[in-house]
């Protein structure tokens, strides 16, 4: 069934993204996320009711102005928040973009994925048909550690990664490295094993933890759960990249 003029709730727009997929990207940040990651740098996107309302056509008209900057590699990335919370809007937006030949990337943590819901899967599979690339943030491979880190289980997230791979959609995998929290070598080895089981992974990236979003927690009056966390050293990043076999996935 065709979406009936779905409305999207957009947190913000970035016209010249350079780290959100291949080439120069126009990045759309959608509102709403159910995860509560301890290192989240966009906590203002959590609330589903926030953001500015856009129609698919309005948003695409804004994005389309920047097409001359994308070249052959660039395009559109939709991030968040968690964009899969607005899947109807996202699907209509990507379908319009692909009809114009635009490369589309979905930047997601996968939390809304429902592997046991046939109706949801049908909608998800439709979205994947107009998705050129999925950028998946694998936060933690161990279920209990994932719950401690985000407040949610990760079984459905891992199932989503497998499903995307089975559909043949290209994947980039990202992992945020927080010393003392997400740098356990055994967990990183298990993550590498999982990534190796996926057939469509093109790139694996280690993202060093940073504190650039700390002021947002303070502005919102939320206690920051990692007051003593520090960014990883270059050697810690190198070791994580080695364990995750980053060199095998040049992208």
Task: Indicate where each model-derived feature is located.
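Short, conserved loop/turn and helix-capping segments at secondary-structure boundaries
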Residues: 53, 151-154, 231-234
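Auxiliary Fe-S-binding modules of radical SAM enzymes
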Residues: 1-19, 172, 177-251
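Short cysteine/histidine-rich metal-coordination sites, predominantly Zn2+-binding motifs
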Residues: 51-61
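Short glycine-enriched, charge-decorated loop/helix-capping segments at active-site entrances
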Residues: 44-48, 147-153, 221-229
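N-terminal [4Fe-4S]-dependent radical SAM core
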Residues: 1-30, 35-52, 65-72
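Short glycine-rich or small-residue beta-strand-to-loop segments that form or flank ligand, phosphate
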Residues: 77-79
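Conserved AdoMet/S-adenosylmethionine-binding subsite of the radical SAM
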Residues: 64-68, 72-75, 84-207, 212
């Amino acid at each position: 069934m065709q979406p009936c003029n779905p409305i999207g709730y957009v947190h913000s727009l970035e016209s010249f993204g350079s780290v959100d997929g291949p080439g120069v990207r126009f990045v759309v940040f959608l509102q709403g996320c159910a995860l509560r990651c301890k290192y989240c740098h966009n906590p203002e996107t959590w609330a589903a009711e926030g953001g500015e309302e856009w129609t698919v056509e309005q948003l695409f008209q804004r994005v389309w102005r920047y097409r001359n900057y994308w070249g052959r590699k660039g395009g559109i990335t939709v991030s968040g928040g968690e964009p899969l919370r607005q899947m109807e809007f996202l699907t209509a937006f990507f379908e319009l973009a692909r009809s114009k030949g635009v490369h589309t990337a979905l930047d997601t943590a996968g939390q809304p994925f429902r592997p046991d819901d046939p109706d949801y899967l049908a909608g998800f599979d439709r979205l994947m048909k107009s998705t050129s690339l999925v950028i998946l943030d694998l936060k933690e491979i161990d279920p209990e550690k994932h719950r401690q880190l985000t407040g949610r289980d990760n079984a459905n997230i891992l199932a989503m990664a497998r499903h995307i791979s089975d559909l043949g959609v290209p994947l980039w995998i990202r992992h945020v490295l927080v010393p003392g929290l997400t740098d356990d070598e055994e967990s990183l080895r298990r993550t590498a094993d999982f990534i190796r089981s996926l057939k469509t992974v093109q790139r694996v990236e280690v993202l060093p933890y940073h504190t650039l979003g700390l002021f947002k927690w303070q502005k919102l009056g939320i206690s920051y759960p990692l007051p003593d966390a520090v960014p990883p050293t270059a050697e810690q990043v190198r070791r994580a990249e080695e364990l995750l076999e980053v060199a095998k996935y040049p992208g």
